[in-house]
């Protein structure tokens, strides 16, 4: 049990109920689920809630196109969403819908409190009207040129290019997204939330540590531009909640969508009477509330939402955590343009635990975009999960079952166990701070140590000798205990694997039991727990989504260059572009001392366009090397990897420092570079022969 139990409510942004979940969505739900599972693993009371965002004109119009009622459409989508999440092992404590009685009552409650407190203003405005469809046009159904940055083809509420928010009437050359007609102006009465009244409170809250620094800095730009009153009204016809005392007027979807967090929790409280809504949402609540969101909805969650809560007498969230976008092989994912892999398409071909681990290995607390590079995905999963983690058990468990009655020995030398347990606080801190990539590197470094221990001891040789049976029993028991610790550390990321390992050990994996003595404990016969990623399955998934995986000009200009599985810039005949060099004799080759090296640390070099500074462990000695691979790798992607270096190259003094060798890489250059990565059995310091 954790030292002091916390009460935590955690949410992910609500997926829109007009289409399927894709892998861009899944980043957020996997990120949040890992954090929620970690909190529960530490013994905290943590509730992970979500819901479908089920209102708005897009849903109304799509239902019309399908010839069904909006209620029927969102019910079907809700069912599909929940199935996708369940199959990805995302464990919500409650999944609801914003089109619910709980949410209607909460939205009305908050609106009426804001109105009674003087924060709702009414005024007549000129609204864009589609003369062909005889309907007012919601902001998402007007497209034109952004009035701020002049980017074309932007929606009527905010710009995807610069992030600015504005009124649809401010768009340059607006067009109806419904009919294509040029809209006309028509007067209508709307209600506005007085956001400027909360400027002082918001400036204090956004700098209180509730937001990432990058988010807080962005909000400062909006403060400088001046906060505007927020139109919370949409005219009929509209699928949503009617505003109290205002027939024909409806809440804008972005008013009742975040309230959906509260509505979903209300629904959970009704199912579990021991829960108190006010204990988590009351103004004086000491519970913790955290929102995980994408960087595209920062404005709504960091300005409108806390102001609405404050103005209606509820508490603000402790933190709002934003993440970046997902790209696939360097291409921007866009649902509107169809460049996405559906969650169900992935599940039809690949194990969801693969993606959970890959996302975790690349996630940090920053708001960086994350590239799902399918080649790297396959290599990393096969190397880390199959080659290192599961391999540790598969190569030792059989000896315990066949030769030692399935019972573990009392471990005499606990040096390795103590070293593994000593990392629990570091790994815990990384989970808590959402630095999952760093946690995965720590865990895989331990897996390397464990595999090195088994390789050096070679129990498969020991069991051939009568006088080494006890030693073999010790080695295999030690290895399996280390495996148990590793999988416990990974339980928030790999819940299905953890479940299989619990069945194998015939006991639960808990953080409190990390140091448990398993002497004499009986294990079950080992069964295969994870298969390698097969490229034919990856290719089949790509084929099913082939229209979504083309690298186009839509790739984000600010994203770091990524390596693609089949980069068009790489020649199909490398020998044509780079012929084999002149023949050398064996004595010349023998002078080159190639060694396995682990990249302990990688970092950018100030004022260097191409270089990364690497600290390399070559087995008892550390070398500093400057490598020209900055265009192809980010530092966090390199740390923990094994590679090959020229160890006897004369040190070279550079203006950035001394370079004590060279790492080997293949490719024509630029983003098309791949460092050499040896098989997982290789160890730092080994000579390459």
From Swiss-Prot:
It catalyses: tRNA(Met) + L-methionine + ATP = L-methionyl-tRNA(Met) + AMP + diphosphate. A motif ('HIGH' region) lies at residues 15-25. Binds 1 zinc ion per subunit. Residues 588-689 form the tRNA-binding domain. Its EC number is 6.1.1.10. CDD domains: Anticodon_Ia_Met (cd07957), MetRS_core (cd00814), tRNA_bind_EcMetRS_like (cd02800). GO terms for molecular function: ATP binding; metal ion binding; methionine-tRNA ligase activity; tRNA binding. Gene3D superfamilies: HUPs, Isoleucyl-tRNA Synthetase, Domain 1, Methionyl-tRNA synthetase, Zn-domain, Nucleic acid-binding proteins. A motif ('KMSKS' region) lies at residues 332-336. Zn(2+) binds at residues 146, 149, 159, 162. Its cofactor is Zn(2+). Homodimer. Belongs to the class-I aminoacyl-tRNA synthetase family. MetG type 1 subfamily. Is required not only for elongation of protein synthesis but also for the initiation of all mRNA translation through initiator tRNA(fMet) aminoacylation. This is Methionine--tRNA ligase. The lineage of its organism: Bacteria, Pseudomonadati, Pseudomonadota, Gammaproteobacteria, Alteromonadales.
